[in-house]
Amino acid sequence: MELKLTDLAFTALPNGKVLPPGILSSSSNCKKCGLRCDNGLPYCFNCQFKCQVCGSYDNLLIKNNSTETLCKYVNPKDHVYKFATNRSAYKMKYKLCSKCKDYVLCAMCLTFNQNAFAKEIWSYEEPLFVMEICKKCMHKHTCDECNTPSSSNIKIFLDGYIYCNKCDEE
């Protein structure tokens, strides 16, 4: 039997504990909790299948965002073009339990909310795709033309500009 250096080394876990040699090898550690996982995946069962809203392990389902377009951005003016041209890179699945299945991940603040608007992102003439935005993020924006506070009645354009319905018609 051939010994590897990892078999002889003490293993430090992310929580600060140290395990004696041979208990863990680097190829079978959960990347989140550091415990041994033999499922061939980077995360153990508990870390991989946990509700992302309440933390429950019961009755889990994997939910695709209904819009198929989630992205990690905060300011749409900076990232909307990148988001639209490379949407497949931002597709995201999330795990929710049966109690939290109605929550939606807001594409702007990346928090889970029950009340979200499905907003279309527009080119000049037509909507290109849809993303879900929570009420809190929706009300943060003002119309780029008249500076009135936004509501659910706004259009977000591919170039990042936001217009209220009144200014968009003009």
Curated annotation (Swiss-Prot):
The protein's name in its UniProt record: Cysteine-rich uncharacterized protein 241L
